[in-house]
């Protein structure tokens, strides 16, 4: 089965399941399974997909068809230029939250301020502020131990120092 065939199969299945972003989701899942950038799928659409990868791709597509969020399947979210690990223990960062970060970064700028991110979850807000406002001292807290571990991992992943 080629990359093109895999994508068409998953797109049809996801579309029939009511997934509005069926094309994007199919591409994300296949690039995740193949461990290649999404753009490479389009460039290499006639490349054969090995049987193990195909089986995994079908499993993940079926999971997505049941409305499991894409970010929970791939454990990944892009947020404000950051690479974040995401799982069921934290909320998926939303575009509206990027707007909040943009405004906070604009206000903080290069000032030496203390910033507290309550209920940090994945740490996306704290990490974005720490990344773009190096003079700020950022602290992130959450009641969930699992969320704190994810936020710590995301801070390391994005090379920022957060307390």
Residue map of PLM features:
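SAM-dependent Rossmann-like transferase core, predominantly class I methyltransferases
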Residues: 45, 55-133, 138-153
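S-adenosyl-L-methionine
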Residues: 152-163
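Short helix-to-loop capping/linker segments positioned immediately adjacent to catalytic or ligand/cofactor-binding
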Residues: 15-19, 112, 163
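N-terminal auxiliary segments of SAM/dcSAM-dependent transferases
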Residues: 1-74
